[in-house]
């Protein structure tokens, strides 16, 4: 589905015979469907917020699941391990943080957002950062990525949200 969230209606298609059933499932969720190539690699998510006074790029979270991809079951039925901070090389962590900040600025984002990436390998075996999606209204439950990242940064979510509201402009 081109809209919605939580990977509702999303399938991983490995051969042509799986395409039609996957499309049927997707169209049950939305009247618009998007097909994209699969990127093999490590999925990470990084939160960021900016106020009139500062930029805070939160520690990235690494997503580890035994499922085919980070699907609904992995997200909501405990079939995932979330590691914050993500196990990235210092160079890759810096590249992701700079990319996250640049995307925030390009979008003229406000408040707190989260950007998901796949870290794949290039032909020389070096990390390649691939932006997957931008979440402008990220989840804020106690187990969501942003609160985890805020805690990993040694911050309190109430203080962060107050800071954003009080110092946005």
Annotate the PLM regions.
Residues 1-2, 36-38, 104-109:
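Short Gly/Pro-enriched turn/cap motifs at secondary-structure boundaries
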Residues 90-169:
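ATP-dependent carboxylate activation and anion-phosphoryl transfer catalytic cores
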Residues 14-98, 126-130:
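Phosphate-binding site of ATP-dependent enzymes
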Residues 1-21:
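Conserved anion/nucleotide-ligand pocket segment
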Residues 1-4, 77, 137-139:
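Short connector loops/turns at beta-strand edges and beta->alpha or beta->beta junctions
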Residues 5-7, 81-84, 142-146:
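Short small-residue beta-strand/loop micro-motif enriched in glycine and branched aliphatics
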Residues 1, 37, 44-46, 117, ...:
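Generic detector of well-ordered alpha-helical packing
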Residues 7, 11, 43, 141:
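Gly/Ser/Thr-rich beta-alpha loop segments that engage phosphate groups in nucleotides
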